[in-house]
């Protein structure tokens, strides 16, 4: 999972400096809000919305030029409307997914590790990541 800057393919954006003069939509108080507020130039107009649904709606209705959100939220837009011109411009913050297992639960730990290894060796683990997270897996640690 990651938070990113998304916009139409016609906008040339590769870094926070490229947001100069643009209207940027973000969910107020979110991690994305904190990151983009710190990184964006002072003349970028950051518009904060009350929740993700309002933020996504603001982008699709043209209220903002640029969307800052999680990759799964952005993927939901293009899934709902495959004709929507929306591409990732850059990653704001990478947020790897982890699983916690109660200390001492060796059976579950072994099961999870074997499942991951089986899917990785079978070539299916990256496909699962693509399906649910919309991105390739990062390099995995050795088991």
Summary of predicted features, one role per range:
Residues 23, 63, 132, 136:
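Conserved functional loop/turn residues at catalytic and ligand-binding sites
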Residues 1-9, 75-117, 135-143:
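Periplasmic-binding protein-like
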